[in-house]
Amino acid sequence: SSAASDVYKRQAGKRTVNRKSFNFLIVTRIMLSNLKKYQLILASNSPRRKELMSGLGVEYVVRTLPDVDESYPETLVGAAIPEYISRKKADAYRSMMKPGELLITADTIVWLEGKVLGKPEGREGAVEMLRALSGKSHQVFTGVCLTTTEWQKSFTAASDVLFDVLSEDEIQYYVDRYQPMDKAGAYGVQEWIGYIGVKSISGSFYNIMGLPIQKLYGELKKL
């Protein structure tokens, strides 16, 4: 829509960079010298994804569109779901992209016993999700899509997370204090609940935060 396009254009000049790590930025530019021909665009308002991109030491622009459709076919399971959604998010931006732009879209889900735990609907939804995760192992899948006006490629990352048994008081405290309604599975592994509740992790910690940054770095080096 024209309204969405206007929002996209207004965001075009807003560069984001970790200013405190200037020397690190210079080194990263050398290692990712192949990216000079691209303007990186992160299509996400997630504070975690912004933090991870800044930690990578690259300059990027944040651009978002309202109400991007994140539905997916019911036949998809596991890692195929966020990969499909990440590509669908990219397709929503594609008509507005210019040559030389490299769009990064991502989607993360929590996969528990064959079911998706997305973002909870309200406080009680968050409490119910944490009760379901308590004392069990689950998977976190992230799909990432890289898109230009000429090509598109996507990949996935998976992490296994084992939660200790959470008391009702711990669940209630976390939900009230941290308001995790914007997080898949109703928890942030980097927050208090991760300190006291996560017993073990197999795979990328940063994938659980929402962006498998090491894998993304590897893919960017290949361009």
List each language-model region with its residue ranges.
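Short, small-residue-biased leader/transition segments that mark boundaries at the very start
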Residues: S1-Y8
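Short hydrophobic targeting helices and cationic amphipathic motifs
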Residues: R19, F24-L25
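A short beta-strand-loop structural module common to alpha/beta enzyme folds
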Residues: Y60-S71
